[in-house]
């Protein structure tokens, strides 16, 4: 079994030393879902939400969150991201919004946490903007879809 990289021999949490790692192109994709009523989703899709463009706000929030992941997750490195993309899709058949994020850089450590943070914060932003009309929305299935680059290689959800 692979060992935890953020825990030293004394069991203490530490930031991983990436000084001697080589730079590679690294990319990660993550997703999250927000389930809601058909009425709430229709309000978002039609642009009739009183707070404005929910998708645009969630997209910007997700991008901003990816850039600030190192401030939110204690042992994450500050990264110079070369690309952050957040796509939101209304799934009318299931009354959900699907959020997919992509983060990319050339660096010494991966961008999985940045992609997961982008998707999560975009989902939280949708909840925040819509909670006045529906409080029982559900954020679910936040997960890493794919990552490339680095020593551990390629991972993709089956």
Curated annotation (Swiss-Prot):
One of its GO terms (biological process) is Mo-molybdopterin cofactor biosynthetic process. It catalyses: (8S)-3',8-cyclo-7,8-dihydroguanosine 5'-triphosphate = cyclic pyranopterin phosphate + diphosphate. Homohexamer; trimer of dimers. CDD domains: MoaC_PE. It comes from Mannheimia succiniciproducens (strain KCTC 0769BP / MBEL55E). SUPFAM superfamilies: Molybdenum cofactor biosynthesis protein C, MoaC. The gene is moaC. Catalyzes the conversion of (8S)-3',8-cyclo-7,8-dihydroguanosine 5'-triphosphate to cyclic pyranopterin monophosphate (cPMP). This is Cyclic pyranopterin monophosphate synthase. The lineage of its organism: Bacteria, Pseudomonadati, Pseudomonadota, Gammaproteobacteria, Pasteurellales.
């Amino acid at each position: 079994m692979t060992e935890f990289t953020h825990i030293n021999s004394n069991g203490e949490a530490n930031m991983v030393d990436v000084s001697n790692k080589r730079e590679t192109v690294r990319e990660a994709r993550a997703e999250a879902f927000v389930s809601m009523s058909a009425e709430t989703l229709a309000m978002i899709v039609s642009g009739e939400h009183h707070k404005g463009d929910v998708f645009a706000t969630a997209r910007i929030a997700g991008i901003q969150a990816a850039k600030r992941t190192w401030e939110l997750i204690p042992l994450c490195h500050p990264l110079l991201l070369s690309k952050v993309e957040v796509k939101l899709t209304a799934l009318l058949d299931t009354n959900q919004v699907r959020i997919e994020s992509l983060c990319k850089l050339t660096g010494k450590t991966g961008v999985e946490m940045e992609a997961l943070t982008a998707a999560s914060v975009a989902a939280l932003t949708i909840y925040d903007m819509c909670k006045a009309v529906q409080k029982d929305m559900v954020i679910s299935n936040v997960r890493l879809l794919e990552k490339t680059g680095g020593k551990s290689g390629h991972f993709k959800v089956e």
